[in-house]
Amino acid sequence: MVCVFGAGGGKLLRFKGKILSMEYIIQVDENNREIAPIEKLEAHRRGLLHRAFSILIFNDQKQLLLQKRNGAKYHSGGLWTNSCCSHPNHGEGLKEAAHRRLQEELGFDCELEEVFSFSYRAELDNGLVENEHDHVFIGRYDGPVHPNKDEIEDIRWVNLEEVQVGIQANPQQYTYWFRHLMQHYADRIIQRV
């Protein structure tokens, strides 16, 4: 890992040939209490528990919007996952961050309801570790979607049954956290759709 400086003086990191900005997310304890700000890549390199969110957007036909992560992402690139997922920045509220990322990644905003949270840990194939306390939001939307190509390769609307069959048949095509979410919490999600 090499530290470089951007044109605006911001600190950037080069990791495995990719340049990443220094984003500070929220390290938490097992009860989701804030411990300290932590640089995002450092949290993933050290496997530190941190706050995250996953957004599930459904249309009027009860189809879920999936995104295929851009292959250049620092982890889990080219895999299918929930509509939107990210981390609140240090000093930013969860719901505020969820709305911000929905607009940045998919080009729209809608009402979001936080429905539950869960924790998981996964060692990724590139040596990074996801160790997250993940807050799940559900929203409804039927308008146009404008994916940010820096974040997303593709999108599609699918029925939940289709997702479950796809995960069972080809788990390697989906992110770990989305598989975990659908395998352990699908009933809670279905009740809210």
Annotate each PLM feature.
Residues 11-21:
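Short, Lys/Arg-enriched N-terminal segments with co-localized hydrophobic residues
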Residues 21-54, 60:
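Acidic, metal-coordinating catalytic segment for phosphate/diphosphate chemistry
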Residues 41, 78, 90, 116-121, ...:
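Nudix hydrolase/Nudix homology domain
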Residues 42-53, 63-100:
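Conserved Nudix-box catalytic region and its N-terminal flanking loop in Nudix hydrolases
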